[in-house]
Structure formats: structure tokens, C-alpha cells
Amino acid sequence: MVLMEDMQNKDGHNTVENSSGGTDSNNNIQMRRMRKTQLSKKELFEKRKSDVLIAAKSLDTEIQNVKNLKRLSIGSMDLVIDPELEFKVNSRNSYSSDSSKESLQESLHEENIIRSEQKEEQGSEDNDAYEEGDATNVDDSIDITQTEYLHDEETLEKEKIIRNASSSTSSSARVTSRNRRLSGVKTLAHDVVLDVENDHDSKMVDLTQNLLWVPADQHPNVKPENYLELIQDTLQNIQISTNQDIDENKLELGNNHVISNRKRTGSVVRRPSRLKTSYTKFDDEPPLADKPQEGEIQVDKRISSSDIKTIRSVSLKEITEELTKISNNAGLTDSDAVTLARSLSMSGSFTNESLHLNGNHTENDNEFASNMFNETGLTIPERSSLRRSKFNTYKIRLEGSSLPQAVKLNSLMNIQTNDNRRSASSPASYTQVPQEQASLNDFHEIFDHYRRTSTDWSTENEKYVDSTNYYSDEEDLTHASISQESSLLSTDSSNNSVLIKPHNTGSMISEKLDQHVSSSEKSNTNNSEANHGWSWLNSSNGSLNANEQTYQQLTDDEDDEECVDNEKADFVNLSVSRRAKSTKRASERINHSKNRHSPIFQIHSEEAKSVVITPSVVSSSESQPSKPTAPAVVEKKVELPTDTQASTHKKNSLEKRLAKLFKRKQHNGTCKSDVKVIKKSVKKELKKKASHSSLSKFRKSPKKKPQEAEVERPSSPTKTITTEDIDTASVIEPEVRSSNASTLLPDSHTSHSSEFVVETISELDGDDSFDISGGDVNYDVEVHSSISRDTTAGLEEDIGAEREDNTSPTAPQISTLPPRKLTFEDVVKPDYSNAPIKFTDSAFGFPLPMITNSTVIMFDHRLGINVERAIYRLSHLKLSDPGRELRQQVLLSNFMYSYLNLVNHTLYMEQVGTGDIAFNGDSALGMMDKNDSDGTILIPDI
């Protein structure tokens, strides 16, 4: 005690003892008791600080663990930004320990004054009561500081009631307990009475000043390495003050951002994120001028802890309604599978907001994290995080074109036609002797044809065959050209996503441009097939622009140097006649969502039509092997039956799409020597990656080149030709057979070219996952194995027909599912563990794995379309987190594939239910023909 008194004397408290005069011993005893009380209070205060500091350190460790778990569980909001784009967003001043020091130093100074005043006021009170009340208050502060967040509200209320009852022995103790508190902690006792003026501020309590608990919306701004320092600074500045003093300083210490955010009624989209405020901060915060209005009425009110701490929770119903509102603003009003499938993609065409939002609306709900400006002035990329590292197949369309659609289409076709004429008239394409090797070694020419669609070439050819219908149907066909001008072709007013492969003819989800199907489709079907967008093939056809006779003679010259003379005429005949059906049927056939379920053997009527054409074609090719006029005659004969049976052709061409979808191109030489030439040149071409043959073999798509296949097929029924030629004629018609053997030949004509166009999709994609045909290897084997066999054409085609009948069903059966709710029996399990994944075609422009049990289960647990879309997009964000462990990435990927299978099958079921399916005929015509475009995979419009 002597030592303690010396310490007190050093502090200057001995002046009080000397002033008392030493005569009164009772006063000395009272002063000593006060010193004891104050000293024990200081010791307790220091002990409390040390305990809290220890707790803070352990809490910091726990917070680090929670932070790591949060990264795994919810993904980082940083993933709204493209992960490959490196920049930092610092839109708010970080909550640093320096700012907390300044604010708390002010409260420290003021509370020191208050403490001295309280000591003077209560010096004459009963010291026992003072000690009891003060200890009670300290205990209350300790409990609130350390353990409030560890208990539920009922436990806290019971403890506080007990403490309040124990402190009720003295009125002064109650006054002390009511008026004194920690600066950073809100006492939540039920006997606290406040005005409504203070009520609003109490609800908007300064969360950042809480001692040990940083609010969730402040976490990103308190760096983890500085968090312990923040706690230490706060502990050093803990003081006991009165509520009145705190109320006076509310405006200085309060977090106005939190207050204004809570005052805002807002919607779900507008509510500040508890994960990261930097992406949800808006500049249109209400001014602070209306804050005094909250406290104009003076009414005593008891405040419960639940009132202060309650933050309005958002129900699933509210989220669904909010997402519905957003979708309505975006024009996605329907809740069917078509809308969902169209809107699942996070990339694609982001249309101009003024088209469906009138441009002037700046409503809260139209601001999203994905297209919002940060305070740094940097815009988060619209494309979000759907980027491929190696094969970047996504491209945002340009939106600047305001030309009418027809004008854009016509101008584009003129440009492309001029380009075609230039490339067609180039002498290199004629001077090179072999048909197969013509221009094959020109690397740039190969990639030029990648940038063109078969519809570009068919446009050119059609212009000279049927000039009256030149633009009528081409508007349907050319809007998805993969050339550099193609980005102008899609309308910005549509909400469809467009997946464009930058320099290849690839699959894309395209929007429907035209609602009409013009009658020129018939002439297109007969005249637009031969070129298929290949510049080296077009070069042989390019002379049609000047003279059709010259074109035939040039082609005959090339064929003379390769093979026998009669094959020359065959090539000439069919190169023109088979121009008919390529582009139209190929583009129609690309909608995989419908074709995957369509019947395989429903194409006999169109074959029957072709039977009428075949005899004339064959006879002309046999009797006039070298006459240049043969193509024109054949072409006219081909046109007439198609014109007479236009409606039937429409229906059957739609039905043929599935049958041709899984077929691959066959390598073809016009004779055995050509086959050897191909084999020799394949190695060179593989190295150069510049020839069609090498590309098709590389991509597991061993189909024949269309024109070469055309050369031999007409003559095959009447004479013996090369075995590869014969086998190709049978192989190229995989899925479709008619009871009439004579239909085999025209079917091979009509089917092959469309297969060619579809093949360019998977062939140029650079990804073997698109090779979804199970019979690809068999086709390749057939081509090479049949080279060694010599027999008559009719016999070989019959054998090939039987073979193909066995092979063709297997490929489409991989993806054929009944138009009903799926069951576990529909799930096809692999034959053995770790078997190669089999992919099916889909409506999304990329293949999907086979359905799994997850897809079947999801049928019974469907959410709203907007909720499902949000979940899928959030899954994209999670999956793009580079720090996520592989197992979680696999689980996410499996879920997303299962969900896409669900949407794909639901889309198919809806189309069957409404009659909008390919084999239902004309009901699908209006929906599908207007989407015609080479290299596109279509999802129907709303």
C-alpha cells in the first residue's frame, strides 16, 4: 500500500490529501478507499485490455481461416472482371488504422474530461455502491466486446437482465450503468431509453467503430495484414463515455455511406453488397440534408437489440421478382426454354441499351456490376470472364452500323461477290494441273476461303443462273458470313447471343433476321451447292461470271490432266447441278437442338424427286463427256422438278438435316493415281496446314471433296470406275436410304455438299470434341480399305448402302432422346471406367456430354428461369477463378453441363409440344428457314 500511495503521489493525487488538512482522520480513510477503488479499477482495465488483445490475435487467425473459406465457397467478386485483364479497382478510401486513430483520439480527449467530471461528482457518494456499479459496467463492456457475436439474442438478453438486477441495489449504480458505455460498442440493455432523434442514429450505428468485428461491407477495405494493427489501435483508445457525448459526435463518427445505403429503399440489385462494395457503389447517393427530418418528433422509445441490429433479409421470392423485372427490361419476357437457352451465354452481342431501354432511362435496376463504371474511370469488361486461353471463339459484334438490313446485306454480298470474282479470275487457279492441288499450296487463299461462307459462292453462282431471285433468299443465307464485314449483319435490336469465330467458319448462336421464306429457295437449292466456300473450287467455277462455256472447258482441261475424259464431263455436269442444295440445307440443318431428335429415315420423298433428275444427268454425262453445253442442260433439268415440288422439298430438306449432321467428308481422288497423289501430298499439307485434305484428315473428318465426288458418281451406274470413287458414292450418303436403288445416286449428290458445309464448322473449330459422329473412324477405314477393291459401280454401291445402313443409325443414336421427361433409364453409362467422353450436339453452338443422373434429378427441382440463369452465370464466375482447386472446378463443370443438357432437352420438348420441330414439316419452316446462315447454330427467337 505504501508503494501504491507513492505512485499516487507521483500522479499528483497527494494534493487532495494535503488540502484535507490531516486533522480529520475520517477524511483520510475515505480518500484511501477511493484510491484503492481507482487503482483496482485501473488494474482491471489494463487486465481487460490484455485479455482482449489476446482474443483479438486468436480472432485474427480465425478471420484468416474464414477468409480462405469464403474464397472457396462464394468465389471472389473480382471475377466480374476479366481474369486476364490486370488492373486494380480502388474506388473507396480504404479504412486504415490512421483514420481510426484520429477519430478515436478525439473521443479519448473528450472522455478524459468526462471522467474527471464524474470523479468530482461521485466523490461524495457511497464508495461501495460506486465500486459495485463501476465493476458491473466494466463487466458489461467486457461481455459485449468479446462475446456478443458468439451468442444468440436470447442468451444476451438473459445475461443483461441478470446483470441489471444485480446492479439495482443502488440508484447511482443504475445511473452510471445507463449513462456510461464504451465508445466503440453499443450497449444493448433493454432499459436504455433514447429519443427518436437518437433512434435513427442508433440504427445507423457506426459499424466501423465496433471493437472486434469489422462489418462485412468493410472487409475488403481493411487489409488483412493491417487488421491486427487496427484492433490494437482501437484497444489503446477504448474509453468510457456518456451517451449524450456520443450523440453529439454522431455526425463526425458515423458512417454516412452505410446510413445512406440503408435509407435507400432500392431493389435487390441496388442493395450494397456485403462482399465487396467497390463494385456496388453508386454515385447517386441521397444528400445528408434530409437526415434531420428523421428526428423532428421527440418521443421516448425503448430500443431492443433486434431493432438496432436488424438488416432486412431478402427472400427468394423477392430475388425472383427482381430478376424477372430485370429480364423484362432486357426484353427477355418469356419463361420458356428458348428464352433461357438464348440468354444463358454471358458473352455475345451486347445490344445498345437505347434500343429497348429508350436510352434515357437510368433506373437503378439497369446498373449492373458487369457494365458499371468504377470511380477510376475504368469500365469492367462486358464480356466478363468467358475467355478461352487458346481457342478464343467468342467475339463481340460491332454495333455501329445504322444501315437498313437489306442495304447492309446487299452491299456485303456485292463486296463479297467482287472478291470472289477477283479470286476466281486469278490465273493460278487454272494453271495448276491437278484439280486437287489447284491453289492448295496458297496459304493465304486457304484462309480466304475460311472467311467466306458457302453462301457467298452460291450467291455468285446463283446470280447467273436465276438473276431474278438473286437477293430474295440470300438475305436469309448470308447474314452470318464470317468475313470481316460479318459483324454488321446481325441486328442489334435482337437479344440473341452471337458466338463468332474470328477468322474461321465456325458455329455461332445467331439471331433470326428474316421472317419470310421466299420462293427463290427453290432456285437456290438447285444452283448454289458446288463451291461450298472453298476458294480453290470457286476458282474453277469463277469463269461463270464471264462465260459458262469457258468455265466448262477450263474444268475439262483440268480433268484431262488428271483422269479419263468421261470423268471430265461428269465433273462439269455435277459441279453446276449440285450447286443446288448445299447452302440452304446446310444452314437449315445446323440447328442441332432440333436435329438431334429428328428421325433418320424420313427423306425418301426428296430422293424420289431426285430420281427424275438422275437419268438425264447420267445420260448427258455418258454421251457427252466432253461437250461444254452439258452443264446447262443438266442444270435446267434439275431445276424443273424442284420447282414443281417446292413445298415438299422444303419439308424434306428440313428432315434431312439430322441425317446429314453426323456425316463427315470423304477424301476423294478422281482416280487411283489421284488417291496416290493425295496420300503423298497429305504429309506436305499436314505440315503446311493449308489444304482441305489435310485439314479434314487432321480433324477426323475424312469426307471427299464435293466436286471431285461429283465427278465420278453420275457415271458409276453404267461403267466400272475406281473403287474409291465407288465406295465414296456409297459412303457419302450415310443415313438416308430409299427402297429404290436408283435413288442412291441423287441422294449422294444432294447429301454430300451440305455435309461439307457442316463439316467446316467442326473442321475449322480446332477442337476434336466437335467430332461427335461415332462412325468417323469407320468412314475413314472404308475409304482406304475400299481402294483395293475393283468391282462394278452398282454392286459396290449396294454393298456400301448396306454398310451405311448399319453405320448411320449409330452416330445419331448417341444423342437421340425421347421428347419427354427424362428418367434414369435414359442415362447411358460408359462401357468401362474412364472411357472417352461421348459428346452430343446441342443448341448452344458447342457439344455437350451425354446426360447424367444430375440432369434427370434437375427435372424435379426447377427454379424460375431468372433464378436458374443467375445460378448458371454465377457458376461461370466461380469456374473462372484460377485459384479454385481442380476438384471443385470439375464439380462445377459437371453441374453446368448437366444444366445445359436440361435446358437443351427442355427446348426440344417444347418444340415438339408446339409442333416446331423439323420432322413436323412446314410448322418449323417459318422458324428455321429465316435463320439460314452458313456456319451458324440457331436458337429460335422469342
Curated annotation (Swiss-Prot):
GO terms for biological process: establishment of cell polarity; positive regulation of G2/M transition of mitotic cell cycle; rDNA heterochromatin formation; regulation of protein localization. Residues 99-122 have a biased composition (Basic and acidic residues). Residues 123-134 have a biased composition (Acidic residues). Residues 483-497, 518-541, 617-627 have a biased composition (Low complexity). Residues 1-28, 91-142, 483-541, 617-654, 682-728, 788-817 are annotated as: Disordered. The keyword Phosphoprotein applies. Acts as a negative regulator of polarized growth via an alternative mechanism to ZDS1. In heat-stressed cells appears to play a role in localizing BCY1 to the cytoplasm. Seems to interact with, and down-regulate, CDC42. Also acts as a suppressor of PKC1. May act as an integration point for distinct signaling pathways helping to maintain a balance among these different pathways. 'ZDS' means 'zillion different screens' as both ZDS1 and ZDS2 have been found by a wide variety of genetic screens. Present with 105 molecules/cell in log phase SD medium. This is Protein ZDS2. It comes from Saccharomyces cerevisiae (strain ATCC 204508 / S288c) (Baker's yeast). The gene is ZDS2.
